[in-house]
């Protein structure tokens, strides 16, 4: 199950949910065009 299906806050604090459905940090997860939800961590 991907984090995208658990929006709006699917990830641990400080992480973002990417458009590919994984929680993580950095531009690949949090950046514009890459983030699905919880984009400020």
Curated annotation (Swiss-Prot):
Pyrrolidone carboxylic acid carried by residues: 1
The keyword S-adenosyl-L-methionine is assigned to this record: no
Gene3D superfamilies: Endochitinase-like
Keywords, comma-separated and alphabetical: Antimicrobial, Chitin-binding, Disulfide bond, Fungicide, Plant defense, Pyrrolidone carboxylic acid
Keyword Repressor: no
Chitin-binding type-1 domain: residues covered: 4-41
Record-annotated disulphide pairs: 3-17, 7-37, 11-23, 16-30, 35-39
GO biological process assignments: defense response to fungus; killing of cells of another organism
Gene Ontology molecular function: chitin binding
Self-association and partners: Monomer.
Role: Has antifungal activity against P.infestans, A.lycopersici, V.dahliae, G.zeae, A.nicotianae, F.moniliforme, F.oxysporum and C.gossypii.
Protein name, entry field: Antifungal peptide 2
Organism, scientific name: Eucommia ulmoides
């Amino acid at each position: 199950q991907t984090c995208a299906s658990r929006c709006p806050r699917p990830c641990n604090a400080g992480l973002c949910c990417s458009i590919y459905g994984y929680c993580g940090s950095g531009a690949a997860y949090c950046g514009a065009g890459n983030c699905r939800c919880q984009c400020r961590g």
